[in-house]
Amino acid sequence: ASSLVNIKRKNSNEMLVLAPSELDYKPKKCQRCFYLEKNHKIGPKDFPPPVFSRFDVVQQAYYKDKNTSDLTKELPSGRIMNKDELPGRVVSETLKDNKGREFILGGRPDIVIKFDKGGYGIIDFKTTKISDDKSENYKHQLEAYAQIFSKPGSTKSKKTPLLNPITHMGILQFDPSDIQSHNNNSCDMRMNISYSPLKRDEKDFFENITKIIDILDR
C-alpha cells in the first residue's frame, strides 16, 4: 500500500522528478523505453539536431526586448521575463497524481511572459511545419509549466517564483518559406509565423500524469 503513496526511483531514495518535455511524446512512443530510461537510466541520448537549438537562440534574441503583442496579435501587451527574474531551472512543490503518488515537475521554460494588465503566459518557440492545432502536441508540457509556476518549489540554490494566474499558453511556430537573397557567406531566409493557442486543462493533465506513473510503477 505504501508504494501507492510515494514512488521512489528504483534502488534509490530520490523523489520522482518529471520534466515537462517528456510528458507528451516519449511515453506514447515506447512505454518500455520510457520505463527503462526513467527507472534505470537506460536509453538512447536522443538529442535534437543542434540547428534547432540555434534557431531557438536566434528567435529568442530577436524577440526578448519586444512587446509580446508583437509576437502575435492573439497575445495582449506584455514583456518577456528575463534571466534575472527566473532561475535557470524551475521546479514545482511536491504534487500528487490521481492515485495519491508524489512527484515533482522540473524543467527550463522557453518563454515566460508578464502581461501589462495582469496574468502570465507560457509560450514555446518551435521551428516546424505550421498547423492550427500544433499546441495539442505539447499540451502536457505547457500545462506542466503552468503547474510549476502556480505551485512553485525550490532547488538547492533558488526558489521558483509564484506566477499566477497563467492566462495564456501556446506554441509560436516558425516555418522556413524561401530565401530572399544571398552572398558568398550568408543568405536571408524568410519564415512564416503562426501562433497556436492552448487552453488549460488540469483534469486531462493529471490523468496523463497518472498514466505515466502507472507505467513507471509496473
Residues of each region from the PLM?
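Metal-dependent nuclease catalytic cores that hydrolyze phosphodiester bonds in DNA/RNA
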Residues: 1-119
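Metal-dependent nuclease catalytic regions and adjoining charged, substrate-binding loops involved
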Residues: 3-20, 152-218
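Hydrophobic/aromatic-lined pockets within catalytic cores
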Residues: 40, 127-130, 150-154, 217
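Short helix/strand-bridging catalytic loops that position acidic/His residues to coordinate divalent metals
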Residues: 46, 126-134
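Short, conserved loop/turn and helix-capping segments at secondary-structure boundaries
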Residues: 57, 135-140
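A generic fold-level signal
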Residues: 104-106, 137, 164
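Active-site ExK catalytic segment of metal-dependent nucleases
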Residues: 108-110, 119-129, 141
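An active-site-proximal "capping" alpha-helix that borders the catalytic cofactor pocket
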Residues: 139-151
